[in-house]
Each structure stands twice: as structure tokens, then as C-alpha cells.
Amino acid sequence: MPGLTIGDTVPNLELDSTHGKIRIHDYVGDGYAIIFSHPADFTPVCTTEMAAMAGYAKEFEKRGVKLLGISCDDVESHRQWTKDVEAYGGKQQQQQATTTKVTFPILADPARDAIRQLNMVDPDEKDAAGRSMPSRALHVVGPDKAVKLSFLYPATTGRNMDEVLRAVDSLLTAAKHGGKVATPANWKPGECAVIAPGVSDEEARKMFPQGFETADLPSKKGYLRFTKV
């Protein structure tokens, strides 16, 4: 379905949240932010997801990435539900002797207008009143307020926060090097990145004094070049 996608500017909506009124562009500020929706409060998969996101919040904070949740429940519902989220997350963290706290705001969109503008509507899910429900959507928004990456999951599939964090690390790595590098399949921080096709070998030698390795492939085109970044 058409809607907000990579490269589009996220709409500058103002909504009530668990932290008061929030205007999205002001919240994103000069850094990165993750805006993620969940179908409904007090539901099983959403509770595990929100607890997982809360558990990863410090990792995102280390990277200068803010978190912003949203669903169609009201603010009071969010506040009551986060007690369950924190209790569940705390039980999962007992072995690490840590606690789970939802420190980031959750937006309330009972009118469903924001989830439509953010392209977060699940076409297959309705509530008891027949109203639209959010999908498990996630947008990573950059300092320019444009969408850099999107995930879209159905209600039946919880998101993997390790993959969200890995994808954010990939975006930040590419941005740090001006788009001159990209990350290959299954990449993890600390592993080699690949040099963008538009970078000549001569330019690559200047940009990456640590050197690079070109994969020996049948085509002999020399396009697959790995370097430590």
C-alpha cells in the first residue's frame, strides 16, 4: 500500500504521549530516532516487544538514537500497561540483576490519523469496533527528518531487537563514512564493510589507508571490496 517510505520526510505530527505533548520533528532533533508502532496495549506479543525495546534502550542511547512508541490506545492505557511491561521485562532480566523501565514516550493516537500518515496501518487487523489497528511497523528517522529504514511486521510476528540494533549500526556506519561504504549480508559491528561501487580504487586507497581486499570473482570486475572501518 502506498505511503511513507525510505527517503520521505516523516510528518511533523503533534500528539499526546506518556511524557506529555510531543511534536515529532522536535523530538527527533538533530539526531536519529526510532518510531515504532504496536497493535494494542495489554496484548501478549506487544508486551514482549515493548519489554525488549525497553531492555535495549540504553544501547540505542549510547548511539544517540531516541525511541518513540505509538499505538491507538490512550495515554492512561499506556501508563497502566507499562507496569505490566516493566514487570515482565524485570522477570526476564533477573539473571542479569537489572530492571526494565520504559523510559521513552509512547504516543497516543485514538483517532488513527497518525498511524495512517506514518504508514503503520495493518490492513488485516481490526479492533472489536471494526477500527483500524497498527501493524508492527518501525521507522528509523535521520537528523534530516527523513525515513532511513523501515520494518513492517504483521501482528503475528514479534520484532527482533538484535536486528533493529544491527540495522541502526549499519546506518550509522554508512553515514559516518559519507555513504562511501555499505554493510554486507549478516554484517555485525567490527566486521568488514564493503566499499561503494562509485568509489574508485585510487580514491579507496586514500580514504582507507588501512587497505582493502578485493574478492576474486569469475567476472574479474573488482567490484566487491572489503575494508575495516
UniProtKB/Swiss-Prot annotation:
Q: Which Gene3D superfamilies match?
A: Antioxidant, Horf6, Chain A, domain2 (3.30.1020.10), Glutaredoxin (3.40.30.10)
Q: Which UniProt keywords apply?
A: Antioxidant, Cytoplasm, Nucleus, Oxidoreductase, Peroxidase, Redox-active center
List the InterPro entries hit by this protein, alphabetically. AhpC/TSA, Peroxiredoxin_AhpC-typ, Peroxiredoxin_C, PRX_1cys, Thioredoxin-like_sf, Thioredoxin_domain
Q: Where is this motif: Bipartite nuclear localization signal?
A: 205-228
Query: Active-site residues?
Result: 46
Q: Which reaction does it catalyse?
A: a hydroperoxide + [thioredoxin]-dithiol = an alcohol + [thioredoxin]-disulfide + H2O
Domain of life, per the record? Eukaryota
Chief subcellular location equals nucleus
Q: Where is the Thioredoxin domain?
A: 4-173
**Entries under SUPFAM superfamilies matching the protein:** Thioredoxin-like
Compartment list? Nucleus; Cytoplasm
- Leader peptide range in chain numbering: none
Q: What does this protein do?
A: Thiol-specific peroxidase that catalyzes the reduction of hydrogen peroxide and organic hydroperoxides to water and alcohols, respectively. Seems to contribute to the inhibition of germination during stress.
The Swiss-Prot or TrEMBL record describes its family as follows: Belongs to the peroxiredoxin family. Prx6 subfamily.
The misc remark on file is: The active site is a conserved redox-active cysteine residue, the peroxidatic cysteine (C(P)), which makes the nucleophilic attack on the peroxide substrate. The peroxide oxidizes the C(P)-SH to cysteine sulfenic acid (C(P)-SOH), which then reacts with another cysteine residue, the resolving cysteine (C(R)), to form a disulfide bridge. The disulfide is subsequently reduced by an appropriate electron donor to complete the catalytic cycle. In this 1-Cys peroxiredoxin, no C(R) is present and C(P) instead forms a disulfide with a cysteine from another protein or with a small thiol molecule.
Q: What is this protein called?
A: 1-Cys peroxiredoxin PER1
